[in-house]
């Protein structure tokens, strides 16, 4: 059986997201022109949570969308017809916007690279910033997060899992050894 360690409990996750929300506001001098885009699946739920924090702080709703990266992944060689493809849902234009791309765990950077490609196919934002709940290191690509909830150095054989409840609210972050 895997040895599991809770890295962040529910209140720790909330504190991390609140801090990220404040950092996003500070860096962008408010919410004007700001949109949130979560990477399916975990990043979407975290983007929604981040949007709620921004409303609590600023009293203004920030548009929130989702990007699916299935067809942009670089670890798929042909035979893509059998892949479960999610849906990219951007109920707003990203043209000229400040996009905050949100994901649960940053590891090799390959998911983020795929998300950047998918976003650029949707338009040309003025900037793209990256917010992640956990950065575990081990990059294969030169990608770094602008906003990080928690840095958790891991070995390549370990895994980080962000758990969500039935309402898709993050409940804890677990290190699996």
Swiss-Prot record:
Pfam families: Pribosyltran. It comes from Geobacter sp. (strain M21). Keywords: Glycosyltransferase, Transcription, Transcription regulation, Transferase. It catalyses: UMP + diphosphate = 5-phospho-alpha-D-ribose 1-diphosphate + uracil. GO terms for molecular function: uracil phosphoribosyltransferase activity. GO terms for biological process: regulation of DNA-templated transcription. Gene3D superfamilies: 3.40.50.2020. HAMAP family: PyrR. This is Bifunctional protein PyrR. Its EC number is 2.4.2.9. InterPro entries: PRibTrfase_dom (IPR000836), PRTase-like (IPR029057), PyrR (IPR023050), PyrR_bifunctional (IPR050137). PANTHER family: BIFUNCTIONAL PROTEIN PYRR. NCBIfam families: PRK05205.1-1 (NF003545), PRK05205.1-4 (NF003548), PRK05205.1-5 (NF003549). A motif (PRPP-binding) lies at residues 99-111. Regulates the transcription of the pyrimidine nucleotide (pyr) operon in response to exogenous pyrimidines. Also displays a weak uracil phosphoribosyltransferase activity which is not physiologically significant. Belongs to the purine/pyrimidine phosphoribosyltransferase family. PyrR subfamily.
């Amino acid at each position: 059986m895997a040895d599991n360690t809770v890295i962040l409990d529910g209140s720790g996750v909330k504190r991390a997201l609140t801090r990220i929300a404040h950092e996003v506001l500070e860096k962008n001098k408010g919410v004007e022109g700001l949109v949130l885009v979560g990477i399916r699946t975990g990043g979407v739920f975290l983007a929604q949570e981040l949007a709620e924090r921004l409303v609590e702080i600023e009293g203004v709703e920030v548009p929130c969308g989702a990007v699916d990266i299935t067809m942009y992944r670089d670890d798929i060689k042909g035979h893509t017809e059998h892949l479960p493809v999610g849906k990219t849902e951007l109920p707003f234009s990203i043209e000229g916007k400040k996009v905050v791309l949100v994901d649960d765990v940053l590891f090799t950077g390959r998911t983020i690279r795929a998300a950047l490609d998918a976003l650029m196919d949707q338009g040309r934002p003025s900037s793209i910033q990256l917010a992640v709940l956990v950065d575990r290191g081990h990059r294969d690509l030169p990608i770094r997060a602008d906003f990080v909830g928690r840095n958790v150095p891991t070995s390549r054989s370990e895994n980080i899992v962000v758990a969500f409840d039935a309402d898709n609210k993050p409940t804890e972050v677990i290190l699996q050894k």
